[in-house]
Amino acid sequence: MTLLQIAAALLVLAAAFGTVNYLFLKLPSTIGILVVALAASLVIVIADAVFPALGITDTVRGAVLEIEFSEALLEGMLGLLLFAGALHVKLGDLRREWLVVLLMATLGIGLSTAIVGFGFSWITGMPLMAALVFGALISPTDPVAVMGVLRSADLDPALETKIAGESLFNDGVGYVVWLILVGLAFPVAGETEGGTLGDAATLFVQEALGGAALGLVLGFVTFRVMRRIDDYALEVLITLALAFGGYELAVLLHVSGPIMAVCAGLLIGDVGTKHAMSAETQTYVDGFWRMIDEILNAVLFVMIGVEVFAVTITSDYLIAGVLSIALALVARFTAVAVPITLLKPFRGFSAGTIRIMTWGGLKGGISVALALALPDSEWKPLILTATYVVVIFSIVVQGLTVGRVAERAGGTPPLI
């Protein structure tokens, strides 16, 4: 299949699955599309079992494997999705919660990676470094999944800022940690030039701080240009160029593209909106990026649903995946509870913050993409299967119940 054919097929499936969800299931759009995609995949498997001569599963698996999921997400869609998400997080709100967000996106990721890594190594017998790679890719909360659920759940604004801000930044931090650990665990295929902790620390600083600096510089330059223009079509195009071009420039400069996209989006969404856009331009920019967000979300969740055909399903792998769900939840609880406990003597937190942020820390497509991007090894199929099980549980079960958890903890309306 050509790239255009794959894109057309994904858009058709996203529209069809979204329609089925809207008319019948009536679930939050992203979750509903994923559920329908999984159901369609199950129907294909059943049809293949009933009519094996048709070879339906093999045909579909071949088509799915042609989709470079990791490349499509990590080098294409992710920059746009993060930029769109960051546009709608106000700097003033984030400034009030910056220390919580910073600790959860750094200390929290480190704690979660260690807990999952040691636990997964103990459960499966996997070498510790390889298990830590799994810990790194499953620890970040996915901003795409989180933002999709936040649109449907009526949470306390301060709590929503914590969850959204953390998900935007820990994604970039988690990716850098994953990159470092892949270089240490798989040195032949890794991207680090050396296997020392010094090299790892240098890479982390280069990727994280370099990405933030690039995002702020590009965002500021774009802001200055937009101040001189009053043409909504051109200004929408400029923001698109910033998100797409800036991400690719970050890749070329070997700095973090995700962190670049978040920093640029935050600056344009706050300072740019206030001082460089007319009311008409604000309306069009906001509407354009909301549509980009919705469309790419729909396509991404279709891709997650059909990636089941790329997963090796055995009883041992499924058991490891189910145990990984509990492991990921324990790690997430620790990643939330420790920073909040450290900050409690200095500031207050609303009731149920730890519970809601633990259950609302959804995993998503980024974890699957990182698992698929691992170099081939004897442990990759197990890591991919465990990742897929955790992600599906997180999006479907946690995503559908986080509203009820929030209601019991803080009196907000239910999600559905």
Predicted region positions:
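Transmembrane helical cores of multi-pass secondary ion antiporters/exchangers
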Residues: 1-416
